[in-house]
């Protein structure tokens, strides 16, 4: 893969006549994860604004599946793929960015170090998990939900005069739907069948089977379960619990195909062991008017906040309650239209336009 050299990158910046302030968006890798997708959507909107020049920095080693998408948005000349901290430092020295924005768990980690700060006006941190980095001066901290901000202890107590003006919430921007079509014909699912769906990455450390166990209790000829990117453990559980109407969609980055998945299902049957901070997949379902069933996680409960009236969240391990809700959907004992509309209203709060403007305004506040 050809990448611009650090020397040519620095030269192109010094030769430019626009002299717009530079914002570098840093990820450890450009994976399929929600944090990287969030930044990818943001950048589509940021480049339409003429205030800043936007670059993307990331490590050469590791999973960089989204690299082509970022390259298409900002251009190959603004992709900083580095093999070592020294090489990134050299590039930062040449670019002298106005903002270096780190998207991470929020813990103290590279590139927020003094050597980088000497050549950078402002550090901004998106602390996905609410961790605090007090090792260096950070101008603004962004959280993906109020839940995470609360975990960080930075929500403030206005009635006591306690405020944290440099700590803000900007949720995952949702760009959807991409299609009005579905995958029922392709998957062999009748139009009148009731379909539950689950989407998530293949990661044994966060796998939870409450949804699989509950579905096994309600499955019948006209009820199906569609699983996107199921893990080996998930496939094993499908067989172990005797599920016959499971349909698989392999891992994909195709937004149109993912949109068709959401149009295929009636309810998103979510499960993740550690819970969610602010699930983009939930909001994508809401954008397609798909209600949600989920459960309390071991660590994060941000999905209670983001679900609102668009679904149900059961206690951790409560397969019986999860099953009861699934059955109520199938038997039309819940007001599906009301839940569907409530889900859509949740999505309306986090459209790509609204969230991109919110984050861009944080950058502009530092000018």
Task: Enumerate the predicted regions with their spans.
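N-terminal strand-loop element at the rim of the active site
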Residues: 26-33, 37-87, 230-234
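A short, well-ordered alpha-helix in the C-terminal region of glycosyltransferases
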Residues: 328, 335-349, 361
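Acidic donor-binding loop of glycosyltransferase active sites
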Residues: 260-277, 290
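Conserved donor-binding/catalytic core segment of Leloir-type glycosyltransferases
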Residues: 24-26, 190-206, 212-215, 226
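Short hydrophobic beta-strand element within catalytic cores of glycosyltransferases
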Residues: 291-295
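A short helix/loop element that forms part of the nucleotide-sugar donor recognition site in Leloir-type
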Residues: 176-189, 358
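Nucleotide-activated donor-binding/catalytic signature segment of Leloir-type glycosyltransferases, i.e.
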Residues: 74-78, 235-256
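Conserved acidic donor-binding segment of nucleotide-sugar-dependent glycosyltransferases
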Residues: 311-319, 328-334
């Amino acid at each position: 893969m050809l990448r611009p050299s650090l020397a040519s990158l620095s030269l192109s910046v010094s030769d430019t006549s626009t002299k717009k302030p530079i914002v570098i968006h840093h990820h450890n890798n450009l994976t399929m994860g929600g944090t990287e997708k969030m930044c990818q959507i943001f950048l589509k909107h940021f480049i339409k604004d003429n205030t800043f020049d936007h670059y993307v920095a990331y490590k050469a080693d590791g999973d960089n599946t989204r690299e082509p998408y970022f390259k298409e948005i900002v251009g190959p000349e603004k992709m900083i793929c580095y093999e070592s901290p020294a090489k990134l430092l050299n590039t930062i020295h040449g670019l002298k960015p106005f903002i270096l924005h780190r998207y991470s768990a929020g813990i103290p980690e590279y590139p927020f170090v003094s050597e980088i700060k000497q050549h950078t006006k402002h550090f901004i941190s998106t602390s996905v998990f609410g961790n605090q980095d007090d090792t260096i001066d950070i101008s603004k901290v962004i959280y993906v939900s109020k839940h995470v901000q609360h975990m960080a202890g930075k929500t403030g107590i206005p009635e006591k005069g306690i405020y944290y003006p440099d700590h803000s919430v900007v949720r995952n921007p949702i760009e959807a739907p991409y299609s009005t079509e579905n995958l029922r014909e392709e998957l062999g699912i009748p139009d009148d069948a009731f379909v539950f769906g689950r989407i998530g990455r293949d990661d044994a450390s966060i796998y939870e089977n409450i949804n699989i166990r509950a579905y096994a209790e309600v499955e019948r000829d006209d009820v199906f379960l569609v699983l996107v990117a199921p893990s080996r453990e998930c496939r094993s559980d499908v067989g172990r619990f005797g599920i016959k109407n499971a349909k698989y969609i392999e891992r994909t980055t195709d937004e149109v195909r993912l949109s068709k998945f959401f149009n295929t299902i009636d309810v998103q049957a979510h499960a993740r062991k550690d819970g969610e901070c602010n699930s983009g997949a939930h909001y994508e379902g809401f954008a397609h008017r798909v209600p949600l069933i989920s459960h309390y996680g071991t660590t994060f409960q941000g999905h209670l906040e983001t679900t609102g009236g668009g679904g149900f969240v059961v206690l951790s391990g409560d397969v019986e309650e999860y099953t009861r809700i699934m059955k109520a959907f199938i038997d039309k004992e819940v007001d599906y239209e009301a839940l569907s509309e409530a889900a859509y209203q949740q999505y309306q709060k986090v459209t790509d336009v609204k969230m991109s403007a919110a984050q861009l305004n944080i950058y502009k506040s530092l000018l």
